[in-house]
């Protein structure tokens, strides 16, 4: 039974998708580090330009890239969380869609860490052992097992994913903290809109068109000096 996002559900989402939750998301940039090195988010060299360039980059990922695919996969995992065979197939598909070795490592490492930490509440993924689990699939399944609505889980996941990217941008000295908060404030409406849209999707809605982001993700492993694992 699905419940509305009451106080208990809100607290759980804030806990699971908080930077303090021990999944290690801070170690990954999803290729952003390589994009910065290659000057793809230079924005003309000004602080405002870099802020706008990062906002555009993240908006593309949200609407047409890996973050969109994550949303579709999360929604599907939420729907089939108590059907082990279907949940396994969704996770396998998510892993197959990882566009590079580092992205595969990122989603499986985060998925494993999230699953382990979330066992304090539930482990709806036990039937998938010992197979690796993609991060959005783990989040969707755990959220559904606790009766939290799909749209709320999606919104929290999307916000966390974008916050992680903004944090990476700050650590890469692309933007400052004030600029990062400005970006997150402007992404609130797009996140809410995409969460509502993703609830209505199926696996046929998977697909991305962010080729530059996919390329830098694949090239990142060859970067000589790195702060991040992806």
From Swiss-Prot:
Gene3D superfamilies per record: Urease accessory protein UreF
N-terminal signal peptide: none
Compartment annotation: Cytoplasm
Xref: InterPro entries: UreF, UreF_sf
Record carries keyword Coiled coil: no
GO MF term (any one): nickel cation binding
GO-annotated cellular components: cytoplasm
The keyword Cytoplasm is annotated on this UniProt entry: yes
Organism domain of life: Bacteria
PANTHER family the record matches: UREASE ACCESSORY PROTEIN F (PTHR33620:SF1)
Role of this protein: Required for maturation of urease via the functional incorporation of the urease nickel metallocenter.
Subunit structure: UreD, UreF and UreG form a complex that acts as a GTP-hydrolysis-dependent molecular chaperone, activating the urease apoprotein by helping to assemble the nickel containing metallocenter of UreC. The UreE protein probably delivers the nickel.
Family, similarity comment: Belongs to the UreF family.
Protein name: Urease accessory protein UreF
């Amino acid at each position: 039974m699905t419940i509305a996002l009451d106080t208990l559900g809100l607290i759980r989402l804030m806990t699971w998708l908080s930077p303090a939750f021990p999944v290690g998301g801070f170690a990954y940039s999803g290729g952003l580090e390589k994009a910065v090195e290659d000057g793809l988010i230079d924005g003309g060299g000004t602080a405002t330009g870099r802020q706008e360039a990062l906002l555009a980059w993240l908006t593309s990922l949200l609407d047409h890239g890996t973050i969109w695919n994550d949303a579709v996969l999360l929604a599907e995992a939420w729907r089939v969380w108590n059907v082990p065979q279907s949940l396994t197939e969704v996770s396998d598909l998510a892993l197959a869609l990882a566009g590079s070795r580092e992205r595969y490592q990122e989603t499986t490492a985060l998925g494993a860490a999230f699953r382990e930490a979330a066992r304090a509440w539930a482990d709806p993924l036990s039937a998938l052992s010992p197979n690796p689990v993609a991060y959005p699939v783990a989040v969707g399944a755990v959220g559904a097992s606790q009766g939290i609505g799909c749209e709320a889980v999606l919104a929290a996941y999307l916000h966390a994913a974008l916050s992680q990217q903004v944090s990476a941008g700050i650590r890469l000295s692309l933007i400052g903290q004030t600029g990062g908060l400005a970006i997150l404030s402007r992404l609130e409406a797009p996140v809410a809109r995409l969460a509502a849209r993703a609830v209505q999707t199926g696996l046929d809605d998977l697909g991305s068109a962010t080729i530059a982001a996919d390329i830098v993700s694949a090239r990142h492993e060859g970067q000589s000096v790195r702060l991040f694992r992806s």
